[in-house]
């Protein structure tokens, strides 16, 4: 590449066009998708790769859906070779034959040609409301193998040279429970890839192919240099982190452990998961690309935040990920993987972050409140039609970072906040459930010099039919989200069904029957803390008490700050005694 041929203005324009195009793709999906997960919760992702399967732009979206998708692009290149043409669109959701995350995340890839030369790939991926299988939604804890989890679609053309392959779509949509809704969402994803093609071809026509490709090389070179410089500032050594999920959905109440060793040598870093648990029978197993995505994402959190929107293949080159085959972080076919984005997937990110928090305590990051999802299946009496409902509403808040409290209401750690909560009105319009309570809860955040975001309480009444509920997308009843640098972990979660005066405990990774009139109650732990709680600014503790984030009792026993319950003022003398601080000399 002739570096002198790329001027700063052109480079900036090309680089930002890649980023803005991906965001535009997400906006298209927000406006056109129909299912609740995509349209309201934004469980979608979009990115751009080059003809060598190098990642060029992945500015926003769930970590598991993006950073490892170069494996999918490589698979497509290997499978189709020269049999790729302008107008092709390729569908894939198979974790083992196409390297998807789990079956509900359908991805549509479009090769982008300029004058018959393959230049780029784009991907739009979104969580489908159903993918067939034994239970609606895809989070089925009792599946025997991955084929029981749903329809496995290896990379297959659904458009060829611009012509829709209706027979392929007919086969696919005939194997899901809501074919018309899935059809609309599929076309929305395809439309997003067409937007990307239009924008990139316009860019190439404006600046010329060679100039754009020169800019790509410079983009990769700059991010690699920046990340190597960041790693070089970290003290050489090996740093360890670990985290556990409640169980695998098959062997109940037996934690599944992810263990990580991060080794820093000069300007390179290795993230090694070799000490993690072996592959499990249950559905929490991750495939290699999913593990890679989360390990890379966890690493990026500790680097210069101004790079966050611009990470690409260059950023990834200095980081090596080791995940032994046959483990929960690199499962072998036909292992079930349906619950992996929530359970074990979260722990991969947490273990990576815990290790790097030791390496860089001045950038320490605590984990977020655990996901408290569910998939409820029944019939809506208003329409007589079947429905499947899920939510992120009961998730706890974000974990603290060094220097800042965790965000209130953010969710969830594996998505880094890109997936959002829904709203009460939308839930009640779409589903036969009435939301009775939905609020933050006092004393449900992990304490620290900087505390985590608060936990959440959520209650919903079933005004529909009898049905079923899978809690495969839940975790955190037995295992805490890890804290950092002396902070305290977020509290455990709990849930139950209230039925005819009886409380039925609802645990993660189980199947339950739902009856009309049931009240589903969830209380989630919040994010974990960073730093010793006794070092928290007493004025911030007072504000937390006034704002009802923490109680007077927690303020005194955990934070060691004494507050008068009548005047709501700090008792400084008692506080210094509680904290073991010397008395201040009076001014004479």
Where are these regions (language model features)?
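Glycine/proline-enriched, intrinsically flexible loops and inter-domain linkers
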Residues: 1-86, 91-114, 118-588
């Amino acid at each position: 590449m002739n570096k002198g041929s790329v001027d700063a203005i052109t480079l900036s324009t090309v680089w930002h066009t890649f980023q803005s195009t991906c965001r535009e793709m997400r906006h298209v999906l927000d406006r056109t998708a129909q299912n609740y997960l995509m349209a309201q919760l934004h469980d979608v992702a979009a990115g751009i790769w080059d003809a060598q399967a190098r990642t060029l732009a992945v500015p926003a979206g769930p970590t598991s859906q993006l950073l490892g998708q170069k494996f999918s692009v490589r698979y497509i290149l290997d499978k189709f070779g020269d049999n790729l043409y302008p107008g092709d669109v390729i569908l894939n959701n198979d974790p083992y034959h196409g390297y998807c995350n789990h079956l509900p995340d359908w991805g549509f890839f479009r090769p982008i040609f300029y004058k018959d030369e393959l230049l780029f790939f784009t991907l739009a991926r979104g969580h489908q409301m159903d993918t067939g299988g034994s239970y609606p939604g895809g989070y089925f804890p009792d599946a025997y193998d991955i084929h029981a989890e749903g329809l496995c679609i290896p990379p297959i053309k659904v458009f060829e040279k611009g012509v829709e392959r209706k027979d392929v779509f007919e086969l696919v949509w005939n194997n899901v429970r809501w074919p018309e809704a899935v059809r609309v969402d599929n076309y929305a994803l395809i439309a997003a890839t067409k937007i990307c093609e239009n924008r990139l071809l316009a860019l190439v026509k404006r600046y010329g192919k060679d100039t754009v490709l020169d800019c790509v090389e410079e983009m990769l070179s700059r991010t690699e240099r920046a990340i190597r410089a960041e790693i070089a500032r970290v003290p050489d050594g090996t740093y360890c982190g670990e985290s556990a999920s409640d169980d695998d959905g098959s062997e109940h109440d037996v934690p599944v452990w992810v263990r990580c060793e991060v080794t820093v040598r000069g300007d390179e870093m290795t993230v090694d998961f070799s000490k993690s648990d072996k592959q499990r029978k249950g559905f929490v197993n991750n495939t290699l690309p999913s593990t890679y995505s989360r390990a890379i994402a966890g690493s990026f959190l500790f680097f210069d935040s101004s790079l966050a929107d611009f990470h690409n293949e260059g950023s990834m080159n200095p980081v090596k990920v080791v995940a032994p085959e046959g483990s929960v972080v690199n499962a072998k076919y036909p292992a079930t993987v349906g619950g992996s984005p929530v359970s074990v997937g979260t722990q991969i990110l947490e273990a990576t972050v815990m290790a790097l928090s030791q390496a860089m305590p001045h950038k320490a990051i605590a984990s977020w409140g655990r996901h408290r999802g569910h998939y409820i299946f029944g019939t809506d009496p208003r329409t007589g039609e079947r429905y499947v409902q899920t939510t992120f509403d009961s998730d706890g808040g974000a974990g603290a970072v060094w220097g800042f409290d965790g965000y209130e209401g953010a969710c969830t750690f594996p998505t880094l906040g890109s997936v959002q909560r829904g709203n009460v009105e939308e839930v009640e319009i779409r589903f036969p459930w009435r939301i009775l309570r939905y609020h933050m809860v006092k004393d449900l955040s992990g304490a620290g010099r900087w505390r985590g975001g608060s936990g959440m309480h959520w209650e919903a009444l079933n005004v529909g039919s009898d049905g079923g509920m899978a809690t495969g997308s839940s975790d955190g009843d037995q295992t805490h989200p890890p804290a950092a640098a002396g902070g305290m972990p977020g509290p455990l979660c709990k849930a139950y069904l209230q039925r005819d005066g009886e409380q039925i405990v609802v645990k993660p990774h189980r199947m339950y029957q739902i009856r009309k009139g049931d009240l589903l109650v969830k209380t989630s732990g919040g994010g974990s803390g960073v730093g010793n709680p006794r070092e928290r600014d007493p004025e911030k503790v007072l504000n937390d008490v006034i704002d009802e984030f923490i109680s007077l009792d927690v303020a005194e026993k955990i934070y060691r700050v004494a507050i008068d319950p009548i005047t709501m003022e700090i008792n400084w003398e008692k506080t210094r005694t509680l904290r073991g601080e010397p008395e201040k000399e009076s001014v004479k």
